[in-house]
Amino acid sequence: VKEKIKNKTIHLPQFEMTILFLIHFLVGLDALAIVPFSSIMTSYVGADTAWSGYLVSAYSISAAITCLCVRGASNIRREKNRMLFFLAGIILATFFTTLVHDFTAMILCRVLTGIFGGALVVVNLNYVILRSGDENKKRNTAVLMSSLPLALAVGVPLLILLASGEDWRLAFQFLSVSLLLVSILFFGVDRFGDKHQIPNVTAPNSDLFSVSDAIKSRTAWFSILLAFSAILGTFAVSTQFPVMLSVNLGISPNLLSICYLMSGVGAFAAVQFYGRTKANERNVGLLILLLSIAMVVTVISGFQTKSVELASIAFSVFVVVSSTRTLVLVTELICSLPARERLFLISAQNSIQHLAVGVGGMLSSLVTYSKVNSTLDFSPLLYISSLLALSTPIIWYWHKKQ
């Protein structure tokens, strides 16, 4: 009987996996879409466009805290019920964002969206793991995680085109309606599907690497610091790059959507290439250093040029090299850690990522100033972002020497 229950527990139909992928895709798109629309949204409510990074930070920091507080349950039925609750929350929060006309209220809506979005990412990933067998667990998890670069490559350009670059409310209304439709499908799988496929059973507990264990572990501290520095160096710039393109250079919506498309495709191709290659520790360190230098070059050249075409190319290249660097670092860290610490880093990665994105967005807004001609001065950001980009290989080499 136990074996039968186990077999039914791990059975994950392809249709349901598609729905779970769409949930992850739309939640990731909700988080990413704020970046190209942030300057338009702040202008819409009468706020300074230099504050646009706070909209990114509001979502990311609240999502990071939520990821730390929400733990995946071992009961499959409970996880599905929690997913339905968090889906309802993110749908309402995203929709109400389009109704506000005050910057503070907009920040509050993004905080609520981050809370529900962060919780949904954790619970959705855990639900997939619970519903997958050992032979499909890695594949299903990889499929779910690939939704983020796909959201960047396909989702963001489509939203920009849908909104015609200016009507950001239409983009977020489309997001909320899409989430609603996917929620109905997800509810229908349980309501009208074969209910014995989702039994009310509890998976066995494993010996987890706790937060107290992480505090005592030097390796865990280094892994967290390195991952945080890599993501912070990326998003301190990537949150303001499209703002600079829109406000200072007046980039067209079509060109901006092409930038996101090329960035997403390039990052996806780089990820696929790296996943198929084998490199020793020395080559990995050299790759991280070269990618960090490329980040500095693209930032300085992109923000200093007056040509919107050259700046667009620099933005696309920056996204590709920074995304590749983060992937290489996180992959090498996860693969080099012992099993218990590896599980902890995987579960903490979402929180680290959201926190770094939030701090990066807030930091970039703090060092960005408005000029009298209604453009923005990013000069302090160039120095800070260059130091952040180069700090990651320094931390890497320092740890390896230890």
Listing of model-derived features with the role each one plays in the protein:
Residues 2-11, 191-224:
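Juxtamembrane intracellular "pre-TM" segments in multi-pass secondary transporters
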Residues 103, 109-148:
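Cytoplasmic helix-loop-helix junction between adjacent transmembrane helices
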Residues 65-101:
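Conserved MFS/SLC helix-loop-helix module at the cytosolic interface between two early adjacent transmembrane helices
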Residues 34-35, 219-260:
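Extracytoplasmic gate region of multi-pass secondary transporters
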Residues 164-176, 366-389:
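A membrane-interface helix-boundary motif in multi-pass transporters
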Residues 284-329:
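C-terminal transmembrane helical hairpin of 12-TM major facilitator-type secondary transporters
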Residues 339-372:
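A late C-terminal transmembrane helix in Major Facilitator Superfamily
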Residues 134-136, 142-191:
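Helix-loop-helix hairpin linking two adjacent transmembrane segments in secondary transporters
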